[in-house]
Amino acid sequence: MASCASIDIEDATQHLRDILKLDRPAGGPSAESPRPSSAYNGDLNGLLVPDPLCSGDSTSANKTGLRTMPPINLQEKQVICLSGDDSSTCIGILAKEVEIVASSDSSISSKARGSNKVKIQPVAKYDWEQKYYYGNLIAVSNSFLAYAIRAANNGSAMVRVISVSTSERTLLKGFTGSVADLAFAHLNSPQLACLDEAGNLFVWRLALVNGKIQEEILVHIRQPEGTPLNHFRRIIWCPFIPEESEDCCEESSPTVALLHEDRAEVWDLDMLRSSHSTWPVDVSQIKQGFIVVKGHSTCLSEGALSPDGTVLATASHDGYVKFWQIYIEGQDEPRCLHEWKPHDGRPLSCLLFCDNHKKQDPDVPFWRFLITGADQNRELKMWCTVSWTCLQTIRFSPDIFSSVSVPPSLKVCLDLSAEYLILSDVQRKVLYVMELLQNQEEGHACFSSISEFLLTHPVLSFGIQVVSRCRLRHTEVLPAEEENDSLGADGTHGAGAMESAAGVLIKLFCVHTKALQDVQIRFQPQLNPDVVAPLPTHTAHEDFTFGESRPELGSEGLGSAAHGSQPDLRRIVELPAPADFLSLSSETKPKLMTPDAFMTPSASLQQITASPSSSSSGSSSSSSSSSSSLTAVSAMSSTSAVDPSLTRPPEELTLSPKLQLDGSLTMSSSGSLQASPRGLLPGLLPAPADKLTPKGPGQVPTATSALSLELQEVEPLGLPQASPSRTRSPDVISSASTALSQDIPEIASEALSRGFGSSAPEGLEPDSMASAASALHLLSPRPRPGPELGPQLGLDGGPGDGDRHNTPSLLEAALTQEASTPDSQVWPTAPDITRETCSTLAESPRNGLQEKHKSLAFHRPPYHLLQQRDSQDASAEQSDHDDEVASLASASGGFGTKVPAPRLPAKDWKTKGSPRTSPKLKRKSKKDDGDAAMGSRLTEHQVAEPPEDWPALIWQQQRELAELRHSQEELLQRLCTQLEGLQSTVTGHVERALETRHEQEQRRLERALAEGQQRGGQLQEQLTQQLSQALSSAVAGRLERSIRDEIKKTVPPCVSRSLEPMAGQLSNSVATKLTAVEGSMKENISKLLKSKNLTDAIARAAADTLQGPMQAAYREAFQSVVLPAFEKSCQAMFQQINDSFRLGTQEYLQQLESHMKSRKAREQEAREPVLAQLRGLVSTLQSATEQMAATVAGSVRAEVQHQLHVAVGSLQESILAQVQRIVKGEVSVALKEQQAAVTSSIMQAMRSAAGTPVPSAHLDCQAQQAHILQLLQQGHLNQAFQQALTAADLNLVLYVCETVDPAQVFGQPPCPLSQPVLLSLIQQLASDLGTRTDLKLSYLEEAVMHLDHSDPITRDHMGSVMAQVRQKLFQFLQAEPHNSLGKAARRLSLMLHGLVTPSLP
């Protein structure tokens, strides 16, 4: 491998620019290598689906998508404190160095609820360990979903694959250790790559065949056995760019990069498959098709491949990012093109290139901007790869005021359009979405906003599926399928499009600690009032189609560039050069305040205080006073329509300002402005449409203003009035999005073709028709009286509304049909079940809603919980809700009750005004009854032609109108009376029938419980048969089978649910009683056995019974058997012992005597020669000792004399040098003191002689130190500190603080320092806490404690000084959060807060 040091850096950088085409002008043509219009991102697993709102001509969309943006005044620094609620959405980022402080509600221990803008659908339940995973746990494509798990029995690693469309599942096995990383080639690719901790590579091709998932192994590369496990391994796919002529994009790039601990490997899968046919293959057997890149000192963390596969970018924990030129087919070694440390050598954890792979512009170069992250992405930086300069820095920090401050651990992912960066915190239950803006021409890129969304659990890993533009309803609860229903096949808007706003939809699959979930986030992005144009208004005759105006809507109506084009950044100005967070430039150097500044009242403080962070309470006219800037951030309101009676002027809607630290501390508002929860009710709001338009200068056009624009053209719509609690409650909103809202699209499509009508009828009585109309308002198109029904009901339409009233609504059609029927008999309609049983419908889902969900064209994938699939399938099939109501109403006749009013058959109920009737049945009934309506329309057409006899015709028409009004009033009265009677009768019958049936079932259940749990199944079958027989006699023939099916589906679950608690109670009661009996028996038996009376009685009885026989038996046995035998045995034993002892003693004495004699003889023989030798040795030793003593004495005497001579000489030299040094030091000190004294006397003489005093700033520093030292030695502490503080030199103040101990200064009962000196000392010591922090903090604590609050000067100046000190302490804590002195700094900050708060006005 070529060495990096031997390559010229400039040549390598230029070569890298040539490869990436970074030096090419942005607007220049690129005919040599035109790029296709779409691309893929391997890191994000592929391609996004196109946006339905922005499809069309890409050229026109790009042209209209470019917007003129005003320049942003970027600041140096900004601190954003998130609040944890839904108001933390789209908070503007206005600086190049931004610190984002996490909210306290996002912590795991917080009880805060999740965000209302996030919708969660569980996919699978599994417990993942909460830790930071360097790889991905999940991979997402358009067809499949793959995630890593472990087996429950042996803990082996597996990958679960789920089909998104059919929920079919399969398992992929064969891994060693855990799965380190997995990824699809792109969203439309079926190729899944997995890498385990041992480095084994698996590549499968997935396919759905006959409803089953078939997996085919494409590549399996096996590492040698014994390879150490490492969880830092990563998979990087090469972004695949198909040719423009290709229709299918399911094929993927053959190049993939593997990041190991010490190296990176780039593999060509096509070459591997061509050279090997069987798998697995050991890596040692592969000779071609890969290349190895080495050059980092520690493990690799991230990487990226260029689209052409010739450049590899790697990031490592050693802090380096390196670019390598690679050629797999050739023999050239990888060459390092460029390297640099983006985060000052800290470990890197993120490497993202901001390329728009969703729709790539051929004129835009790749790898123009780069995002890097360090320390688990706690710090993010935006880089320009042309100049290698940092454009923006984002830092994430924990809440410093929280009791447990856990540093963030962020997982980041960039969407394919490079417009949104999504982050999840492993240590917090939160998701962040940051908006990214780019300007290729100017070379600028930055993050423009951040949004916070709270979750219920932390996200460990996630995969992005869709990031697209959408239309947000005013309730913000409808899912994407129903929002997309507002666009028909011909491009026609639905009814909900007029009440929508531009928004962003993000679909994710997230791995939480407890489950895998499908997460959808909808929010309104940050809008610029100068850029966003209002939605185009339409007259009553216009058809709501897009047609040629669709590109304009995508670029202007949505407030963003069309999909596929790079976002325009003309409003971004030149970003300044990066600077340290706490560095002080020449303009921002703090001015040190002398004690004289605190001797004046507060009026003069404005002329002295120049620090930008200090706040003054004086007059605003002073030019030198600076007040903290206040930035109020509020969420954009997305409520429905505003009641004109409840609207407020703009000046009344105020927000409490938040403190902004260090330039622009942006606080997100804890709440959002809520509009009136009322809907627009016809008749209740007769005000004209122009009063509904909110007024006020500079108002941002939100969803409310967009709706107001619509209300200027359209009369108030007929909507049911919503209660305030239902409007505000997130639970009600969530339930509404999954229940009632899914029935609207089919019916709303009919209402769309009719146009918008005028105000609702005012002549209707609210008590009689409000219930029926409210039910029809929920599920039918907006009712408006037609030209035929208007005269009958006595309604006066507004001017110009006649051409919009040609088509009647469902309620009007029913009333017209009844009014035009020749038969005089009036039949009542079905009761308003939606009004009476709303609580029941809200708690238990009805059958009609579930069947209508299945009929929708757009629906979410039918995910099922893996552990609850069988239980959920049991209740999947149910019948229509109207059939259930009809069956209950008909069955009431079989229990002995009578209905006084005649009833319609069930068929007529479904065709004459039931609010649950499907649109198909309504259309069928309209077709059958169309003769009367057609006749009335023909009559109107004829009337429209001017006849000759106008007066007669007018008189005849007036008479007919009067008759029609009279007949209509009578009809309405009869209809209301019969409706009320029928509702009360049916309600009473149903209640009595349910009570009777409940009593019978209760008795049967009690008998069943008495017989036992084993006969439960048989009893359920008998109850089902009895119920079927009882109901079949009272129900009509057409409803018999539906009722039987309903009973089979409803009664057994109810019986089983009723049996289970009763059986549980019975078993619990029996077990409780048995436990009590057992405990009492044990207690009684133990007491009985432990009773002394019982024991004594048993002992006495046994003793009395056994005493006599036992004594006689023992006595006889002992005397006859034991004694004789024992005497004989003892006698024989003693005799044997005596004989043996006597013989042994004699033999021992004989042997001892012989041995002693022989031993004595041998010792005498050996002693004689030893004695002779000892005598000779003693004489020899004496002579040698005498000679040695004489020799040693002479040598010792000579050596002692020599050593004494040497030691005395060296001692003289050392004593001389020491005396010289001491004398020299003492003389120098004395001379310095003399010089200081002389200088002081000279200066005093000069001051007394001169007319003006000499400024102390001109004194020499050494002279000042000498004078201060003299004052300290004399005990004048106040004068010494005052002279040092007056010099305005922080080094001189530190010299005094180091010289004098704090205990010596503040230990005296009256503090020797005056109050101005104390205030000046506090201000100067707090100006810079970066050096000698321990000394400064100790003096600051003592000085703050000795401030006199009763002193007027101290009370006047203490507020501003303490505020400045608190700000400096906050900056110190932010800059050095892990400093050992952080605890003392926090304690001092809390002390200052307690001192300042009571004194503030």
Curated annotation (Swiss-Prot):
InterPro entries named in the record: EDC4-like (IPR045152), EDC4_C (IPR049404), EDC4_C_sf (IPR044938), EDC4_WD40 (IPR032401), WD40/YVTN_repeat-like_dom_sf (IPR015943), WD40_repeat_dom_sf (IPR036322), WD40_rpt (IPR001680)
An example Gene Ontology CC term for this record: cytoplasm
Cystine pairs: none
WD repeat windows: 121-164, 167-206, 217-269, 287-326, 335-385, 389-426, 432-475
Stretches the record annotates as Sufficient for nuclear localization: 913-934
Pfam families: EDC4_C, Ge1_WD40
PROSITE patterns in alphabetical order: WD_REPEATS_2 (PS50082), WD_REPEATS_REGION (PS50294)
UniProt feature, compositional bias: Polar residues: 663-675, 722-741
Keyword Endoplasmic reticulum found: no
Residue ranges of the region described as Disordered: 23-42, 545-565, 603-628, 662-702, 717-741, 778-808, 868-946
Phosphoserine: modified positions: 3, 6, 560, 565, 583, 585, 676, 708, 723, 725, 729, 741, 844, 871, 875, 879, 887, 890, 892, 967, 1380
Low complexity biased stretches: 609-628, 677-689
GO terms (BP aspect): deadenylation-independent decapping of nuclear-transcribed mRNA
SMART domains per the UniProt record, alphabetical: WD40
Ranges in coiled-coil conformation: 954-1025
Annotated compartments: Cytoplasm, P-body; Nucleus
Subunit composition and interactions: Part of a decapping complex consisting of DCP1A, DCP2, EDC3, EDC4 and probably DDX6. Part of a complex consisting of DCP1A, EDC3, EDC4 and DDX6. Part of a complex consisting of DCP1B, EDC3, EDC4 and DDX6. Interacts with DCP2. Interacts with RC3H1. Interacts with NBDY. Interacts with TEX19. Interacts with LSM14A. Interacts with DDX6. (Microbial infection) Interacts with rotavirus A non-structural protein 2; this interaction probably plays a role in the sequestration of EDC4 in viral factories. Interacts with rotavirus A non-structural protein 5; this interaction probably plays a role in its sequestration in viral factories.
Entry function: In the process of mRNA degradation, seems to play a role in mRNA decapping. Component of a complex containing DCP2 and DCP1A which functions in decapping of ARE-containing mRNAs. Promotes complex formation between DCP1A and DCP2. Enhances the catalytic activity of DCP2 (in vitro).
Name by which UniProt lists this protein: Enhancer of mRNA-decapping protein 4
Organism expressing this protein natively: Homo sapiens (Human)
Classification of source organism: Eukaryota, Metazoa, Chordata, Craniata, Vertebrata
